From Swiss-Prot:
Superkingdom to which the source organism belongs: Bacteria
Alphabetical UniProt keywords: Ribonucleoprotein, Ribosomal protein, RNA-binding, rRNA-binding
Organism expressing this protein natively: Orientia tsutsugamushi (strain Ikeda)
Full protein name: Small ribosomal subunit protein bS6
CDD domains for this protein: bS6
Its job: Binds together with bS18 to 16S ribosomal RNA.
GO molecular function annotation: small ribosomal subunit rRNA binding; structural constituent of ribosome
Amino acid sequence: MRLYELVLIVRPELSSTEIDKLTDELTSIISNYEGKLVKHEYWGMRSLAYKINRNQRAHYIMLAISANNNILQKLKNKIKNNLEIIRSRFIKVKEISQTTSPILKNQSLEQTAIDVTS
């Protein structure tokens, strides 16, 4: 099985429970066909570089998976038919880092930064 990172951009109107449900649907496809979810990260609500379907912001989700071509086709079909997902991208990787992704590290640094301008 090959390693992939799947990045999803999801509509901003979705609640956290709806996002969890969407993620569970995708992970169940992976596990039903003997794939493996290696890592899951929710990157939060982020601004888009440009409007996509009238959306300025969206939820970002990253799934790192071990999967074969059959699983990839099932996931692509599920994603294609799901109106909640604005964009998706499968990226083939050689290995999956177990550390926190740089996006989440930057997010946590921004939250802990002290505002010295006031």
